[in-house]
Amino acid sequence: AQSVQNFRVNWDDDAFQRCIESRELFRPEGRRPVDFKGKFLTAAGQIDIPRSPQGRPVLVQAGSSEPGRQLAAETAEMVFTAQQTLEEAKAFRLDLHRRMRDIGRDPASLKVMPGVYPLVGRTQMEAEDLRAQLDDLTHPDVGLFLLGGMTGTDLRGLPLDAPLPEAPADFNGNRSRQTLLVEMAKRRNMTLRDLYLEVSGARGHWSIYGGPKEIADQLEEWFVEGAAD
């Protein structure tokens, strides 16, 4: 992450002159060549792309694993995360703030943005009807394929009303999402059908359904309660 940041700022703001008269594209003295030596990576040189008006892109980290949280605390300006409940989201944000304080960063410099999958109708009933229509469009084979890929389980041939089988501990994928889905299935006593319908739309993010006011109230609650920025 530090190496990438160095390359993003290896030109002065006014280095690229693009002067037709002098045929000078950039001022040589405006360069800041990178010579980075880290524990696992060595990188030297510079990129030939000028800085944006903002200086550099926003640094965003996605995920909720232990290494991901620490990386976010050390380097990120925004975190995109999947959290299913208000309490889980609050705990996640507080944990990031604690890690930041431990290394001397101001928690206010990081924005936590949980993913949300809203279905908005004119009324609660209309939103629920829309959800049912979308669920009917999801083929079981597609839903099971998505769910199996996110949990590391082979679900082929299993009854749709069966519970999620035990997920492998050596899953070589998004482990934080695997954990989220396994815990959600246990907490809500979900069948494979319930779970793949949830995954096929929201991909494990927070799903909310209702009228405009109900949706806005729920989003506001997460912000006011300290679950999101």
Predicted regions span which residues?
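Hydrophobic faces of well-ordered beta-strands that scaffold small-molecule active sites
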Residues: 57-62, 77-81, 110-117, 223, ...
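An alpha-helical appendage that flanks or caps ligand/catalytic pockets
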Residues: 1-55, 87-91, 97-223
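Long, repeat-rich segments with strong aromatic
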Residues: 69-78, 83-85
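Short glycine-enriched loops at secondary-structure junctions
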Residues: 64-66
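Short amphipathic alpha-helical segments
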Residues: 73, 93-94
